[in-house]
Structure formats: structure tokens, C-alpha cells
Regions:
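Substrate-binding/catalytic lobe of Class I Rossmann-like enzymes that use SAM or dcSAM, i.e.
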Residues: 205-287
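Short, glycine-/aromatic-enriched active-site segment of Class I SAM-dependent methyltransferases
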Residues: 187-211
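Class I SAM-dependent transferase core
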Residues: 18-62
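Class I SAM-dependent methyltransferase SAM/SAH-binding core
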Residues: 70-74, 78-141
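Acidic carboxylate diad motif detector
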Residues: 183-185
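N-terminal auxiliary segments of SAM/dcSAM-dependent transferases
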Residues: 1-29
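A short acidic, Gly/Pro-enriched loop at the edge of an enzyme's catalytic core
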Residues: 140-152
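A short glycine-rich, Lys/Arg-flanked "PGG" loop and its adjoining helix->strand segment in the class I
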Residues: 165-180
Length: 298
């Protein structure tokens, strides 16, 4: 646990990898799947995995994947969203790119049906999984030719790209003219010193999962606009992300706690619970939001 805390303070790429390798198992056993996003919750949502799949579908529609040909998914994790998208948009070719080699290897195993996955296997039966390619690379130096893709997406991963502006520069380079960069990420919405202890406390679980730069909304928008992109749309969905997730955990804590403490120390579950409460409060008071941003290369 000390190492996890140190990772949140140092916040370099290796720390982000170690952090996600440590916490992804926790997310998997509590959600029942390999999607590593917060999820989108509405009145019909019954559980975290359903919320995650809903957000993945929503993000694909927001990115206009029905008209896309070549998609670069940066920070793809276990590629669960990519497997979902390839089943929904069969003409799509997806390059899954991640600096985390361990997660890429697991994603390749899922792709070749060598391991079980509650979402992936359903998608694989209906899709051309050979249109998914896995590349071990950093987000700021993409091993991709100039003007070779029509979509670059970062699905709840751009908050870890350091420096963020270099990711935007690389996205501009590899995108065709009028190509889209599409981002889903948590942002800070109220002015505050992002490194201050009060904000660290207010962020709750985001202090762990948001292990890189804590970007303010205006910084994200200005960086995108000053590097050759025109922002086409922004959706603010934090009210359907943070609070409902925390409420689900509160309502089902006894069951989820029994699952977690089989594999993790009891104090970690306590930290998780208190962090979710802090995250809910931060969202309620307007300190944080969750955005979907779409911008076109000009």
C-alpha cells in the first residue's frame, strides 16, 4: 500500500503502470469484467459492468465510429472497449496502443480466445477480431505514419499522458485532414492548486486512479485548440458517473466487501469506501467533472 501511495506522488509513467497493475485486479473482481472505466449510470443501469459497457457504447457513438476506418486507441488497457467497438462497427481497423506490456499481453490472449472474458468472448463471436492490432508504445511518441488514421481516441486514459500537449501534437501528426481526436477523461472544474492537500483529499479514489496530471478543464480545451484542432463538441457527464458509482458501492458494500477481502487487505476496502464518498462529494460540489471531447484536425 505504501508503494501505491508513493506512485501517486511521483506520478511518472512507470508508476502509472505499477499502479494500474495493482488496482486493475480490484476493478475486475468488483465489476466482473475487463473494462477499466467508471461507467455511465442511468435509471436502467443495474451494475458497474453494465455502466461500463454503456459508457463504451456512448463513447463510440460520440466518436462517430460508424464513419471511421482506422482507429488508434491510446491507453487501450485490456482492449475490452475495442472488442466491443469492433463488434459494432465491422469495417473498423483498431490499433490498440498502450505502454503497459502486461495488459497488452492479456489483451492479446483474450483476442485469441485463450482466456475468458465476460464481454470479450461475446464480442469475438460476432466480430473480425483480426482487425485489432496491439502495439506497445508511449502516448507521446506514436510509432505511426503521418496522416494515416481518421480517429485517435483516449478512453479514460489521457489524464495519464505526460506531457498532455505532446499527445495532442502526436494526434495531429498521425491524423488525416479532418480526422478526429476524441477524449473521455476526468477534469478539474473549480480553480484550485492541483497539488494541494485539500484537493488531494477531495478527489477521493481519483487520487489513486488519476495518478498523473490533474488537468483543469480550461487547460485541456486550450491545449487542444492551440495545437491545430477545432473543438466540435463537449459533453459533461460527471453527474452520471461519480455519484451513481459511489451510491452503488454504498448500497452493495457488504457483498462487495466480502469479495474484495478474499484477495486484498481489509484496510484497502475501507480506503476504497471512504474514497468513493469523497469522490461523490467532490462531484456534488463541482470540483470535478467527466467530459467527452471531440475535436477535428484543421
Amino acid at each position: 500500500m505504501l508503494e501505491l501511495f508513493l506512485c501517486t506522488l511521483r506520478r511518472n509513467e512507470l508508476d502509472v503502470i505499477n499502479l494500474y497493475n495493482s488496482l486493475s485486479g480490484l476493478m475486475q473482481i468488483t465489476t466482473g469484467g475487463n473494462m477499466l472505466n467508471f461507467g455511465y449510470w442511468d435509471d436502467k443501469t443495474k451494475n458497474p459492468l453494465q455502466a461500463q459497457c454503456t459508457l463504451s457504447t456512448m463513447f463510440g457513438e460520440f466518436a462517430s465510429l460508424q464513419t471511421a476506418r482506422t482507429l488508434i486507441d491510446i491507453g487501450s488497457g485490456y482492449s475490452a472497449p475495442a472488442l466491443q467497438w469492433i463488434s459494432e462497427y465491422n469495417s473498423l481497423k483498431i490499433l490498440c496502443m498502450d505502454i503497459n506490456l502486461q495488459q497488452l499481453k492479456n489483451a492479446c490472449a483474450v483476442k485469441h480466445q485463450r482466456t475468458d472474458h465476460s464481454i470479450a468472448l461475446v464480442s469475438l463471436k460476432r466480430s473480425k477480431s483480426n482487425n485489432i492490432f496491439h502495439i506497445n508504445a508511449t502516448s507521446t511518441i506514436l510509432p505511426i505514419k503521418n496522416n494515416s488514421a481518421d480517429r485517435v481516441i483516449a478512453f479514460e486514459s489521457a489524464q495519464h499522458f505526460k506531457p498532455f500537449f505532446q499527445f495532442i501534437q502526436e494526434s495531429y501528426r498521425v491524423l488525416e485532414r479532418s480526422g478526429l481526436v476524441v477524449i473521455a477523461m476526468p477534469v478539474i472544474t473549480k480553480s484550485s492548486n492541483s497539488l494541494s492537500l485539500p484537493l488531494f483529499v477531495k478527489l477521493g479514489i481519483l487520487s489513486l486512479t488519476w495518478a498523473s496530471e490533474h488537468h483543469k478543464l480550461e487547460y485541456v480545451k486550450s491545449t487542444v485548440k492551440t495545437h491545430g484542432f477545432q473543438i466540435k463538441d463537449i459533453e459533461y457527464i460527471g453527474s452520471n458517473v461519480y455519484g451513481p458509482l459511489a451510491n452503488y458501492y454504498i448500497e452493495n458494500r457488504q457483498k462487495l466487501r466480502s469479495i474484495i477481502i478474499r484477495e486484498y487487505p481489509k484496510f484497502l476496502e475501507t480506503i476504497l469506501y471512504k474514497s468513493l464518498l469523497q469522490m461523490k462529494a467532490a462531484s456534488h460540489h463541482g470540483f470535478i467533472d467527466y467530459i467527452l471531447l471531440k475535436a477535428k484536425k484543421t
